[in-house]
């Protein structure tokens, strides 16, 4: 009966949900919940990266918040605590070539599906930052035929600990990756701009053009 309720069910809401810190009560059942978020959506270069985190009910992590509001040093400290504390965590990555092929919205949703499907523990409920549900096709691509319930929450990364945690591990993973890519493409200063469209980054694009990891369909890249 419980599995029948969950199978292929997707729910999208655009307002705050009646949730406890780490779980949502649905039909009087306490569901194992994963928070999902993505980072790098607005970048001109590099992948979009998503995080998925299942936190325990018995342990809280002080300082969880939207990764954009936390200093870089603090993010890495929190990421370490998340890795140590989480029941399970996952990272999903979609690279620029595919971003250009399917568009950044679809790539962001696919990255979140990827992050969810690599969790070692199957989540019964996904709490997703934003206002979109993840299409079934992406879960199927990563081998899931049994789908969790989904709730999308606007600004969930600022209010839901599991989503905040997902945001933090995605951000630190991506920042570390961009610093590594800086060694391959040092002329673009990815270790500093992380692929975002800073003034200096745009000036570099104007002078030497894009690298193989730039998003060719993005206006900030193709306009140069």
Curated annotation (Swiss-Prot):
Compartment(s): Cytoplasm
Recorded family membership: Belongs to the RNase HII family.
The reaction(s) this protein catalyses: Endonucleolytic cleavage to 5'-phosphomonoester
Lineage: Bacteria, Pseudomonadati, Thermodesulfobacteriota, Desulfovibrionia, Desulfovibrionales
Domain spans labelled RNase H type-2: 31-224
Cofactor binding note: Manganese or magnesium. Binds 1 divalent metal ion per monomer in the absence of substrate. May bind a second metal ion after substrate binding.
Binding site for a divalent metal cation: 37-38, 129
Main location group: cytoplasm
Top-level lineage group: Bacteria
Gene Ontology biological process terms in this record: DNA replication, removal of RNA primer; mismatch repair
Protein name (database record): Ribonuclease HII
Cofactor section: Mn(2+); Mg(2+)
SUPFAM superfamilies: Ribonuclease H-like
UniProt-listed InterPro entries: RNase_HII, RNase_HII/HIII, RNase_HII/HIII_dom, RNaseH-like_sf, RNaseH_sf
Species this protein is from: Lawsonia intracellularis (strain PHE/MN1-00)
Keyword DNA-binding recorded: no
GO cellular component: cytoplasm; ribonuclease H2 complex
Gene Ontology molecular function, alphabetical: manganese ion binding; RNA binding; RNA-DNA hybrid ribonuclease activity
């Amino acid at each position: 009966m419980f599995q029948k309720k969950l199978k292929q069910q997707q729910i999208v809401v655009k307002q705050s949900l009646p949730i406890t810190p780490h779980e949502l009560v649905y039909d009087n059942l306490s569901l194992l919940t994963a928070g999902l978020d993505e980072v790098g959506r607005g970048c001109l270069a590099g992948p979009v990266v998503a995080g998925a985190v299942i936190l325990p009910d018995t342990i809280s992590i002080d300082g969880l918040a939207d990764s954009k509001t936390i200093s870089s040093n603090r993010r890495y400290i929190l990421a370490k605590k998340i890795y140590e504390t989480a029941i399970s965590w996952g990272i999903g990555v979609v690279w620029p070539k595919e971003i250009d092929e399917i568009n950044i919205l679809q790539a962001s949703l696919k990255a979140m599906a990827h992050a969810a499907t690599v969790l070692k523990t199957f989540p019964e409920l996904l709490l997703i930052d934003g206002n979109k549900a993840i299409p079934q096709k992406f879960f199927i691509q990563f081998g899931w035929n049994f789908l969790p319930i989904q709730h999308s929450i606007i600004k969930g990364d600022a209010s839901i600990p599991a989503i905040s945690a997902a945001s933090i591990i995605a951000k630190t993973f991506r920042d570390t990756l961009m610093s590594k890519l800086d060694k391959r493409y040092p002329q673009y200063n990815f270790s500093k701009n992380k692929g975002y469209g800073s003034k200096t980054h745009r000036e570099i694009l104007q002078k030497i053009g894009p690298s193989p990891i730039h998003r060719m369909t993005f206006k900030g890249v193709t306009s140069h």
